[in-house]
């Protein structure tokens, strides 16, 4: 045998033997698989032996036979000795709570239905998935029972896995038990081992900047969710969270022990009573980055259906902020809103006094403010406008139950929650309960600062939007703005607070115009930091006047993360398209095959043009086109284009 052939055999053995050993380590009867309805996703679960009696749970995920998640741990970390002692249950002595769980059964089911949201990015949403429930038991003996109270050292846990064509999600579920099981969750073992060479769009906090970083060298830093990743084979992956209502916020940290591995990092511990389900951990994969955007309904599908009996009062729309807290100035804002096709006026912080003082009373107007809110509500209603107010969480925590009936009596339509604390179990539960209560009084909600959505607006659609984004309050550049559609907006609506005339904006006016089509927010704040008198009849602002804030259909047509985005949205028969580029100029060819075949349209096109002798330098073009025509958009650096297609009769 020659040396070359011998080297090849040795190399083959080095590759095969570890694989065989791994296969032998998998415990008999624990391997379970689940595929998506179209067969693209394959989720594989199994347990490996740890010592003589224990086991560790693992999973892998492939997409079209390409590795997405390599062998990764599953599990929940529970420290239950105090509860067990109080209940007279023998203490659990396992190093990791999940290590002696035994798989006792598996249930499978399928679902395929279509539902209509109260509002959204699409008029109908298909909810189609395959589901697998893995059932586990911890403990053996029947133990002692006292007066009907079960003192057996038995615990039960399920892992529920759903495979959609849009992605895969799993969660931990603790069934109800006769011993009224208390659980003190101190962490999760949930991890995501990515292919070597994966890059992450790292974001340290919800309103922070993004950085494309390898899965190494993060130290103790954590990244926000959603976390979008670029795999070395070109796939785009997003890790998200769904139905986080009374749990704690999860972020992502790097494993100290295993390369290219992300771990779920919980904000703090959680105390629960069974039955209880943890939030869904969601994995989406796209061959193109825009596939992630087009599949974002998965987050809503993982949440319960609407629980409000009457939703007729919930009216999405555009919002103008009034920072001038004087009666006549708010009236001027209402007049401007009525003129410019805006549905709401928002009275910002300070109307009831210094917002950061616990003594400020949000049931009354500050003595130094010339404001009569009930009279303003009546004036706004006469103009077809709704009035909303800002209230800091400091006042909400103390006065919420008093404020809600009062604000309804005044005629207010909504509240913006300000400087909301979010992360631990207490504040997560409080916040979602506050949204529920607002729904009982017919008040819409916009949550500001660090809160990020996980689909609660399906269940309580009076939660219209939320910040949790580096928007125009931070004045980000075009690079940041072209990352957002592929990251933050995957989780749901975001209140970016669109600016237009403000001189601190770093991007072109056409870039800002396009945001109204690219960025989804059922309450879309426009002209942030502007005043009514700033408007001088600019023709391009007819785009903002015409555009709605919710849609019958939405399609991300083209783009690359941090480079550019082309987003099309339909309301009725009209289509609106926004194109945005990063800090580099580029030419984008737009094929209008999203339009109805055989129909002709009038196109209103708004583009940057530095040659114009106007202050906004936006060129307006109006021309007839037919479905399928190609349009060449020359986007200026940090620029964009806004397009409105209206069918011709």
Task: State where each predicted segment sits.
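Bacterial Sec-dependent N-terminal signal peptides
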Residues: 1-29
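N-terminal accessory beta-strand-rich subdomains and adjacent acidic, glycine-rich linkers
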Residues: 25-302
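Solvent-exposed beta-strand/loop surfaces of large extracellular or lumenal domains
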Residues: 123, 144-146, 202-210, 605-628
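Glycan-recognition and catalytic regions of carbohydrate-active enzymes
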Residues: 134, 531-576, 611-616
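An acidic-aromatic substrate-binding cleft motif
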Residues: 276-344, 348
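Aromatic- and carboxylate-enriched substrate-binding clefts and catalytic-loop regions
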Residues: 349-508
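Carbohydrate-binding surface patches
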Residues: 561-597, 641-642
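C-terminal beta-strand-rich structural cap/linker in extracellular carbohydrate-active enzymes
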Residues: 623-649
């Amino acid at each position: 045998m020659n040396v070359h052939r011998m080297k090849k055999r040795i190399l083959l053995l080095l590759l095969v033997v570890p694989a065989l050993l791994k296969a032998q380590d998998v415990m008999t009867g624990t391997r379970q698989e689940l595929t998506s309805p179209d067969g693209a996703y394959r989720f594989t679960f199994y347990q490996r032996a740890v010592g003589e009696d224990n086991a560790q749970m693992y999973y892998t995920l492939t997409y079209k036979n390409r590795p997405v998640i390599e062998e990764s741990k599953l599990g929940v970390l529970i420290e239950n000795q105090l509860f067990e002692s109080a209940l007279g249950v023998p203490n659990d002595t396992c190093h990791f709570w999940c290590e002696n769980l035994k798989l006792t059964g598996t249930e499978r089911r399928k679902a395929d239905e279509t539902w209509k949201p109260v509002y959204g990015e699409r008029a109908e949403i298909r909810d189609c998935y395959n589901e697998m429930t893995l059932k586990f038991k911890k403990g053996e003996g029947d133990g002692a029972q006292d007066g009907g109270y079960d003192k057996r050292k038995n615990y039960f846990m399920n892992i529920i896995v759903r495979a959609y064509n849009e992605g895969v999600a799993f969660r931990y579920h603790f069934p109800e038990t006769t011993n009224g099981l208390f659980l003190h969750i101190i962490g999760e073992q949930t991890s995501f081992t990515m292919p070597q060479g994966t890059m992450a769009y790292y974001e340290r906090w919800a309103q922070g900047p993004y950085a494309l970083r390898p899965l190494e060298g993060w130290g103790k830093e954590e990244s926000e969710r959603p976390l979008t990743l670029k795999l070395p084979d070109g796939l785009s992956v997003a890790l998200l969270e769904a139905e986080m209502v009374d749990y704690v916020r999860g972020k992502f940290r790097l494993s100290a022990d295993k390369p290219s591995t992300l771990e779920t990092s919980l904000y703090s511990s959680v105390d629960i009573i069974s039955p209880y389900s943890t939030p869904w951990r969601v994995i989406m994969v796209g061959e193109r980055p825009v596939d992630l955007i087009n599949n974002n309904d998965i987050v809503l599908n993982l949440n319960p259906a609407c629980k409000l009996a009457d939703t007729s009062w919930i009216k999405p729309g555009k919002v103008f902020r009034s920072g001038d807290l004087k009666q006549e100035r708010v009236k001027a804002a209402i007049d401007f809103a009525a003129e410019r096709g805006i549905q709401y006026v928002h009275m910002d912080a300070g109307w009831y006094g210094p917002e950061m003082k616990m003594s400020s009373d949000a049931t009354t107007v500050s003595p130094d403010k010339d404001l009569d809110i009930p009279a303003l509500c009546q004036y706004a209603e006469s103009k077809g406008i709704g009035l909303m107010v800002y209230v800091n969480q400091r006042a909400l925590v103390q006065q919420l139950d008093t404020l809600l009936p009062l604000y309804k009596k005044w005629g207010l339509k909504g509240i913006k929650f300000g400087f909301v604390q979010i992360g631990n179990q207490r504040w997560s539960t409080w916040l979602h309960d506050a949204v529920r209560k607002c729904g009982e009084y017919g008040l819409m909600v916009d949550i500001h600062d660090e809160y990020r959505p996980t689909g609660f607006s399906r269940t309580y659609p009076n939660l219209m939007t939320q910040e949790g984004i580096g928007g125009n309050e931070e004045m980000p550049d075009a690079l940041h703005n072209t990352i957002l559609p592929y990251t933050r907006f995957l989780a749901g609506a975001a209140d970016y607070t669109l600016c237009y005339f403000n001189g601190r904006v770093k991007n072109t006016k056409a870039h800002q115009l396009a945001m109204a089509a690219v960025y989804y927010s059922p309450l879309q704040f426009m002209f942030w930091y502007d005043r009514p008198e700033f408007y001088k009849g600019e023709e391009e602002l007819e785009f903002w006047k015409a555009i709605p804030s919710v849609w019958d259909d939405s399609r991300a047509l083209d783009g690359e993360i941090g480079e550019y985005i082309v987003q099309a949205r339909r309301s009725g028969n009209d289509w609106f398209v926004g194109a945005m580029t990063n800090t580099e100029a580029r030419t984008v060819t737009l094929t209008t095959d999203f339009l109805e075949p055989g129909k002709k349209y009038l196109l209103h096109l708004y583009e940057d043009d530095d040659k114009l002798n106007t202050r906004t330098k936006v060129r307006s073009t109006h021309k007839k086109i037919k479905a399928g025509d190609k349009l060449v958009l020359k986007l200026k650096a940090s620029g964009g284009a806004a397009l409105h297609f209206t069918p011709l009769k």
